[in-house]
Amino acid sequence: MRKSDARRAGARAVPVPLLVPALVGLAFLLLPLIALVVRAPWSGLPEQLASPQVWQALRLSLLCATSATLLSLVVGVPLAWLLARTEFPGRGFVRALVTLPLVLPPVVGGVALLLAFGRNGVIGQWLDAWFGITLPFTTTGVILAETFVAMPFLVISVEGTLRAADPRFEEAATTLGASRFTAFRRVTLPLIAPGVAAGAVLAWARALGEFGATITFAGNFPGRTQTMPLAVYLALQNDPAAAIALSLVLLAVSIAVLAGLRDRWMRAA
């Protein structure tokens, strides 16, 4: 072997100080999932999955997670553009507020939502008095709770993509007579589509697994607010086998959806 080939082979070799921690991290992530599959009650799984409550909770989870993601897109993308493309006093403070739900315990987020949108809340009392709208302990409340915890993932992803995108394309469009909104819609949005897609996937995954804010703000009512994570928690108290079966369903759905969307959007990127 020539010296140049040996040098190239050495350059491609994975350093042991990086390989060992990487394998430990991979094992840490995979072992709990493997344990879930190994300890699953496979013989009784068909009976567990035949329960109407399972599919009711799964259907509600998918509906609420998708609705929360769409709501996050509608308000989150403009918010990310505002943070990335405009200068205004207190922008850093606003950015900190947007990312606060990432570090806030979900239960605290649920309490905050109750104080804001509950029947006696700052906003909720007026919604109830003027329009007869009650949000807590409803399916809409589940969507709001999931949006609260999931939207920061979308905003961070889209803002990062906007900062990496060259603003001169947008400026050129406005120079040619396009309004700033038209330039955003026709030029900027197609450029940042992969970042928007990645943020939407992260938001959807976070919404699908949301527990703390949901049970605090929306409760745990089968058919109305009981999503899959809540159903797993409830089953774990009385029927661990059912909890494992529900966990497997949620795991399978999450892997299938996220893997499919990731491959599709990574190719588009």
Name every feature range the model reports, one short phrase each.
Residues 9-43, 52-163, 187, 191-212, ...:
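Membrane-water interface segments at the C-terminal ends of transmembrane alpha-helices
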Residues 89, 179-180:
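Short coil/turn motifs that cap or connect alpha-helices
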Residues 165-169:
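Short glycine/proline-centered loop/turn elements that form peptide/ligand docking sites
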Residues 173:
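The alpha-helix within a helix-turn-helix
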